């Protein structure tokens, strides 16, 4: 019963038998809670229930909540691996009462589970209570039979919990276990309380007050209970170990690490770091977070890269973490099915990220090694170098700190921050501005004066209104004449203002005295629609009655493209997985662009399936419906909300199509919260044609597509190209592909023959081969040669051939490119690697070539330099080093 999975089941089953609803863990990304980076406690998903903003169909609940503490003020990242209990990912077991039972029942339930369910010896248990909470102290005496010395009164905030400056709050009672005299530490409240002897494992929070302002508390009419027990801590207690990394789950994970890389753990911090970071990385990815350079994605990247650096310390030569994932899924997939469902995505993300990072990790560590070569214990790495590691090599600051930890070398944090701020300031100085002439103050004042513009464009493309303001040359004007570029505000408009990725409408606004050609419509301030255009006839004045007509053809293309993004979004989620989320879009008249979260390039087959699924819904010609409802109702009905988008109390829900496959069969195909304009039936989209996909950043892919008339034009152009190509190749259009493939094969053969000829010439060719360049230095054969016209990437292969030809010795090859730069490769045969290091020798060559550095293995290393004219000097420098 002491295994992690058994403890979790025992806890949940116990409270279920006592009338509690088992509620699944909420995601690690809190919904509608911008105050939190990640879910870090069991009560997070019930916050609105405790405050009365949300009702649940149950009054008591129990959960095993996934939690992450990394980033923000709750950040345990730096300590993980070096202490017995710090983790970035942990599970919080909890039971909750929403105005149902209170202190007595909470204490009684906890006591019975601890002593009877988990079998902890009563004489080793003790509790803390808030110093003013006499009721809790009396209840512990009554229920547990504790004497006064087992009930420790704490007067500080450690035993009084509050959600914020205002809101529900109340005293806490924590349950501790005495781990014995052989463990250092004193009881809570004593000077030695930071020791490990007395271990807190369960916190009971009694929410009985409402704090209206600091220091002012009123009793709640329906007091509540919020408790939290660390699953990993309870596992330590029941398994009789001092470190969470010695519990069964972590022993299994570290055992897999040992088996995979062949290095025993034996107290290794690296094994512990990798095991913990694998858990947090996998669960974050399963909950929709992907590595990126900002926000939650950057925290995930920091966690992953820290683990990858420790894998490198253990000697891993290729990506490791994805190989450990099956063990994690086996151990935790039953309790958290989302982990098993997302296994393929997690594995691919881990593999790709580690593969990308390994390319720069060694170079960054080499720079770090050089920069700290002269530093001693207690010294500080300068902030400029730390920032260069961050900016150039992708080293998060904490990774640099961790790499120097064993040598007890610090990092100049202030210098790092200064370097980052200087870079930001320089970037700002190069920013040319948006070209917007009117200041935000003008739009704010107009919004205050006239209120929001009424949008009529969902129902009509033509309307009448009254001009409320004319802005010309950055200032409000009374009128505008032919030729003037203006920004017009009207009391109501059928013109859609750019938002949600959809471009603004164009068209014409005319009065009795003048006409304006509108090229764009933007939103300013809070709901102010601003029409940008040029007066093409007469005069337009403030206060004029005007007729407004939207460019119908342009609006129709925008509608088709916007509706197509919804169909593509849903198709992508069906084909790639539910981790796909919209990260940005551009809906223009001639095309659409759509950015989504996904860790790797899409295959041609996946793109074809996505396109086919979208066109299936187009061919249905089913009605596109819109409804207004509350955000909560919309999401409850399955509508997709865009992460980070702000929504009002009432939202517009756009539905289109009927699903034909799987879980979507005979259900609405696409349901999204959206304020844009759309077709009235999917058939009006005409055709969806994906042009391609590309990367716009780590973990984000971009699709580009065309619809309707643009798709027809694109296909016609493609057809013309194929016919022209067929004529050039003197074949039928249907034979173009096979003819091109034959030409490519022929070219490859010729290129290979040419490369082979160059290699032979480079090493001397013909008779004698490379022998002419071989000499003996200090009793060792030395093949030194300067080579032109050979691709630098072929130098290693030539060096291997050189080693084979001389049998035993050292090979130094300098390749000189057309621009005069040089590449150097040094190879040492196996029998001489104890005597000579290829890395040392190639660095000598690099210095002679005007470069510095270089790296590789003792038997093969490479470097470069800007001055290829010094190739012979570089070879002689290596020979001189051999001579000693």
From Swiss-Prot:
- Record key words, sorted: Aminoacyl-tRNA synthetase, ATP-binding, Cytoplasm, Ligase, Metal-binding, Nucleotide-binding, Protein biosynthesis, RNA-binding, tRNA-binding, Zinc
This protein's record includes keyword Coiled coil: no
Q: Name one GO molecular function term.
A: aminoacyl-tRNA deacylase activity
A GO BP entry is: alanyl-tRNA aminoacylation
Q: Which reaction does it catalyse?
A: tRNA(Ala) + L-alanine + ATP = L-alanyl-tRNA(Ala) + AMP + diphosphate
What EC class is this? ligase
Q: Which NCBIfam families match?
A: alaS
Question: What domain notes does the record hold?
Answer: Consists of three domains; the N-terminal catalytic domain, the editing domain and the C-terminal C-Ala domain. The editing domain removes incorrectly charged amino acids, while the C-Ala domain, along with tRNA(Ala), serves as a bridge to cooperatively bring together the editing and aminoacylation centers thus stimulating deacylation of misacylated tRNAs.
What is the name attached to this protein's record? Alanine--tRNA ligase
Organism the protein comes from: Rhizobium etli (strain ATCC 51251 / DSM 11541 / JCM 21823 / NBRC 15573 / CFN 42)
């Amino acid at each position: 019963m002491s295994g992690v999975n058994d403890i979790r089941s025992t806890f949940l089953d116990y409270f279920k038998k006592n009338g509690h609803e088992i509620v699944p863990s909420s995601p690690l990304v809190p919904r509608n809670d911008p105050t939190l980076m990640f879910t870090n406690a069991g009560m997070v998903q019930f916050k609105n229930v405790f405050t009365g903003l949300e009702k649940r169909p149950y009054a008591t609940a129990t959960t095993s909540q996934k939690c992450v503490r990394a980033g923000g003020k709750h950040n345990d990242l730096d300590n993980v691996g070096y202490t017995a209990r710090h983790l970035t990912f942990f599970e919080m077991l909890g039971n909750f009462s929403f105005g149902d039972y209170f202190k007595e029942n909470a204490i009684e339930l906890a006591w019975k589970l601890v002593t009877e369910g988990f079998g902890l010896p009563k004489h080793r248990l003790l509790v803390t209570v808030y110093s003013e909470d006499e009721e809790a102290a009396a209840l512990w005496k009554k229920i547990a039979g504790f004497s006064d010395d087992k009930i420790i009164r704490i007067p500080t905030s450690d035993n009084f919990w509050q959600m914020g400056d205002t809101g529900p709050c109340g005293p806490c009672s924590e349950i501790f276990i005495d781990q014995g005299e052989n463990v250092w530490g004193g009881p809570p409240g004593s000077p030695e309380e930071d020791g490990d002897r007395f271990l807190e494992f369960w916190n009971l929070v009694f929410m009985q007050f409402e704090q209206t302002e600091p220091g002012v508390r009123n009793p709640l009419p329906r007091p509540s209970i919020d408790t939290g027990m660390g699953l990993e801590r309870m596992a330590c207690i029941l398994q009789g170990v001092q470190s969470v990394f010695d519990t069964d789950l972590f022993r299994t994970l570290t055992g897999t690490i040992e088996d995979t890389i062949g290095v025993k753990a034996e107290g290794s911090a690296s094994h512990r770091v990798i095991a913990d970071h694998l858990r947090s990385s996998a669960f974050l990815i399963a909950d929709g977070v992907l590595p990126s350079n900002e926000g939650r994605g950057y925290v995930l990247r920091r966690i992953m890269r820290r683990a990858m650096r420790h894998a490198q310390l253990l000697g891993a030569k290729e990506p490791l973490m994805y190989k450990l994932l099956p063990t994690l899924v086996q151990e935790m997939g039953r309790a958290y099915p989302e982990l098993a469902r997302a296994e393929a995505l997690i594995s691919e993300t881990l593999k790709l990220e580690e593969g990308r990072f390994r390319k720069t990790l060694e170079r960054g560590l080499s720079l770090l090694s050089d920069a700290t070569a002269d530093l001693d214990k207690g010294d500080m790495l300068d902030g400029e170098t730390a920032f260069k590691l961050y900016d150039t090599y992708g080293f998060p600051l904490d990774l640099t700190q961790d790499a120097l930890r064993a040598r007890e070398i610090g990092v100049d944090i202030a210098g790092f921050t200064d370097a980052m701020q200087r870079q930001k300031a320089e970037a700002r100085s190069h920013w040319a501005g948006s070209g917007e002439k009117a200041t935000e103050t003008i739009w704010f004042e107009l919004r205050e004066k006239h209120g929001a513009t009424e949008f009529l464009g969902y129902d009509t493309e033509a309307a009448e209104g009254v001009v409320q303001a004319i802005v010309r040359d950055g200032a409000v004007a009374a009128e505008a004449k032919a030729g003037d570029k203006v920004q017009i505000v009207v009391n109501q408009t059928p013109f859609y203002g750019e938002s949600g990725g959809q471009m603004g409408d164009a068209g014409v606004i005319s009065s009795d005295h003048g006409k304006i050609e509108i090229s764009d419509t933007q939103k300013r301030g809070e709901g102010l629609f601003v029409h940008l255009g040029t007066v093409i006839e007469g005069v337009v004045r403030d206060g004029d009655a005007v007729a407004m007509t939207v460019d119908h053809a342009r609006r129709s293309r925008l509608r088709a493209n916007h509706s197509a993004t919804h169909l593509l979004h849903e198709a992508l989620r069906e084909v790639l997985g539910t981790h796909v989320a919209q990260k940005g879009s551009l809906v223009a008249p001639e095309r659409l662009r759509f950015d989504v979260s996904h860790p790797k390039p899409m295959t041609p087959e996946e793109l074809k399936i996505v396109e086919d699924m979208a066109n299936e819904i187009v061919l249905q010609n089913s009605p596109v419906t819109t409804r207004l409802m509350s955000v909560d109702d919309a999401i409850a009905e399955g509508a997709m909300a865009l992460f980070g988008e702000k929504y009002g109390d009432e939202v517009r829900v756009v539905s289109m199509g009927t699903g034909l496959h799987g879980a979507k069969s005979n259900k609405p195909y696409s349901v999204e919260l959206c304020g844009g304009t759309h077709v009235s039936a999917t058939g009006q989209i005409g055709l969806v044609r994906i042009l391609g996909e590309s990367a716009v950043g780590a973990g984000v892919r971009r699709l580009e597509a065309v619809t309707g008339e643009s798709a027809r034009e694109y296909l016609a152009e493609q057809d013309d190209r194929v016919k022209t190509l067929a004529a050039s190749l003197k074949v039928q259009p249907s034979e173009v592909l096979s003819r091109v493939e034959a030409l490519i094969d022929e070219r490859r053969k010729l290129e290979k023959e040419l490369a082979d000829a160059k290699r032979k010439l480079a090493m001397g060719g013909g008779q004698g081969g490379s022998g002419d360049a071989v000499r003996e230095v200090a009793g060792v054969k030395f093949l030194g040669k300067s080579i032109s016209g050979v691709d630098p990437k072929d130098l290693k292969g030539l060096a291997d051939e050189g080693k084979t030809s001389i049998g035993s010795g050292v090979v130094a090859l300098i390749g000189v490119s057309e621009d005069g730069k040089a590449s150097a490769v040094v190879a040492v045969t196996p029998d001489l690697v104890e005597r000579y290091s290829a890395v040392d020798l190639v660095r000598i060559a690099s210095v002679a070539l005007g470069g510095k550095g270089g790296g590789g293995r003792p038997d093969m290393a490479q470097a470069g330099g800007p001055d290829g004219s010094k190739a012979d000097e570089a070879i002689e420098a290596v020979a001189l080093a051999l001579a000693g």
